[in-house]
């Protein structure tokens, strides 16, 4: 039995199949971890979601910002933006089944035996592992609760609050938790977010660093697997932190990692977008 983690799919199914063939993935015994952003911008968002659903008993998936955007658009079609490739999902006959499965996926997964966490974007440096799991569970509960679901999705958009406060309540509290787990790249040691900077790790504004680079980070004793940040090109010098988004949808590659051995595999992607992997302008 082997367990693999794969970077952002973003609706690119063929590179995923290439990788699973490369390692002779057997869903009867192997397991696949997904860092989120499984849909959007790529050419096969619907096919990708259906394929993952068929493997649902063999995978662990955390939600990314594009996945949450799909759920929000399923409630409010006006949320769709130019460049989204989500409409085919919303018009699919099996839409309800697929979206119900997606909304019940995790915001954060923690494997106690491996002492390894799986998130889409990261964990803010001021949070302990226990705090991060507790906050992730708050968003997961809102997604699973029919009375909170729509209000949460309608209220999750926006950059404020820029920093965590234990006294936050309601939608504002859930929004900053969501932004930490699904949109974060740079922040201060206290967790103040810069959500506008999207380039490489060495381009932080004064007072900011990549979330994983703060010396005071309280999850330094936990291994963390994440995606989201394509400009890192899968490179992270921080021990125990594994970046897996290598910009497939931008014409880069898709990367798969054996989480026990650290061995990586990649399959090249043909970008469906009009530009190749830039340092800027990623979601």
UniProtKB/Swiss-Prot annotation:
PANTHER family: CYTOCHROME C5, PTHR40942
Keyword Zinc included in the entry's annotation: no
UniProt xrefs under Pfam families: Metallophos
Transmembrane parts of this sequence: none
Function as written in the Swiss-Prot or TrEMBL entry: Hydrolyzes diadenosine 5',5'''-P1,P4-tetraphosphate to yield ADP.
Gene3D superfamilies, per the entry: 3.60.21.10
Domain of life: Bacteria
Keywords: Hydrolase
GO molecular function: bis(5'-nucleosyl)-tetraphosphatase (symmetrical) activity
UniProt key word Hydrolase: yes
Species name: Pseudomonas fluorescens (strain SBW25)
Name this protein carries in UniProt: Bis(5'-nucleosyl)-tetraphosphatase, symmetrical
NCBIfam families reported in the protein's UniProt record: apaH (TIGR00668), PRK00166.1 (NF001204)
Reactions that this protein is recorded to catalyse: P(1),P(4)-bis(5'-adenosyl) tetraphosphate + H2O = 2 ADP + 2 H(+)
């Amino acid at each position: 039995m082997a367990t693999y983690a794969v970077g952002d799919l973003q609706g690119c199914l063929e590179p995923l199949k290439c990788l699973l063939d490369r390692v002779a993935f057997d869903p009867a015994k192997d397991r696949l971890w997904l860092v989120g952003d499984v849909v959007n911008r790529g050419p096969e968002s619907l096919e990708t979601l259906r394929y993952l659903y068929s493997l649902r008993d063999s995978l662990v998936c955390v939600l990314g910002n594009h996945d949450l955007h799909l759920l929000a658009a399923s409630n409010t079609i006006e949320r769709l933006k130019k460049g989204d490739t989500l409409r085919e999902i919303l018009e699919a006959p099996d839409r309800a089944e697929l979206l119900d499965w997606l909304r019940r996926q995790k915001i954060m997964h923690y494997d106690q035996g491996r002492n390894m966490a799986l998130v889409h974007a990261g964990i803010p440096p001021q949070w302990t592992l226990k705090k991060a799991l507790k906050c992730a569970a708050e968003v997961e509960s809102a997604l699973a609760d029919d009375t909170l679901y729509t209000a949460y999705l309608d209220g999750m958009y926006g950059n404020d609050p820029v920093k965590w406060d234990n006294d936050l309540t309601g939608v504002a509290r859930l929004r900053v938790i969501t932004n930490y787990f699904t949109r974060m790249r740079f922040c201060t040691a206290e967790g103040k977010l810069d959500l506008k900077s999207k380039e490489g790790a060495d381009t932080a504004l004064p007072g900011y660093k990549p979330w994983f680079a703060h010396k005071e980070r309280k999850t330094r004793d936990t291994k963390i697997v994440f995606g989201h940040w394509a400009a890192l090109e899968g490179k992270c010098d921080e021990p125990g932190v594994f970046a897996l988004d290598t910009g497939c949808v931008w014409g880069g590659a898709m990367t798969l990692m054996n989480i026990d051995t650290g061995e990586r595999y990649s399959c090249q992607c043909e970008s469906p977008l009009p530009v190749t992997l830039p340092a800027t302008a990623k979601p």
